[in-house]
């Protein structure tokens, strides 16, 4: 086998998975833009951290990146218009999607493919709805509402539910997990019917 053939044989599909916990009204943050204590849940956090630890790349908005310390040293891609294109920094890759398209980022950052975790926020979630999620792990805190808060997707501000947005993006609910029944938190995993890397 040629060297090129050996390299191609090791390449994996790019699998993109979103992760979020929302209130009953599909908000991911309060009016101040921050995650309130009412959306913090230990079981959800443990699930989320296991998922990040098993990912090859984690895509954050710059605010989320700053608020969530990278204690494991995960490979991060920070979405920001503060950079000219795609830059390697001490704390990870920084990417301006206005200047460089996703396929070029993948070629540079994940040349052998792999699992991509997308924890948001809203602008990043909206962008990956267009790029294409393979799965979305949507936790919900029942009994919690955040009037005036930030929605998980901008389309929710126009009257669509998070589920309707995911369905329009080609995903379907495939599994429901009772993460923490005592505190009213469950998760629905949405998946694309035909899986495939980009």
Task: Name what the model sees in each region.
Residues 2-198:
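Enzymes that bind and transform nitrogen-containing heteroaromatic metabolites
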């Amino acid at each position: 086998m040629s060297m090129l053939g050996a390299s191609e044989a090791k390449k994996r599909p790019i699998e993109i998975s979103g992760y979020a916990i929302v209130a009953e009204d599909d908000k991911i943050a309060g009016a101040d833009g921050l995650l309130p204590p009412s959306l913090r849940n230990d079981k959800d956090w443990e699930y989320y951290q296991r998922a990040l630890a098993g990912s090859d790349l984690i895509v954050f908005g710059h605010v989320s990146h700053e608020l969530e310390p990278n204690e494991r040293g995960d490979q991060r891609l920070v979405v920001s218009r503060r950079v000219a294109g795609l830059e390697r920094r001490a704390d990870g890759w920084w990417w301006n999607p206005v200047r460089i398209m996703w396929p070029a980022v993948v070629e540079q950052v994940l040349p052998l493919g792999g699992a991509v975790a997308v924890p948001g926020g809203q602008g990043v979630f909206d962008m990956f709805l267009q790029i294409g999620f393979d799965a979305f792990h949507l936790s919900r805190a029942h009994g919690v509402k955040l009037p005036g808060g930030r929605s998980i997707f901008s389309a929710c501000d126009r009257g669509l539910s998070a589920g309707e947005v995911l369905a329009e993006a080609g995903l379907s609910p495939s599994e429901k997990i009772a993460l923490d029944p005592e505190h009213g938190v469950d998760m629905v995993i949405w998946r694309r019917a035909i899986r495939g890397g980009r």
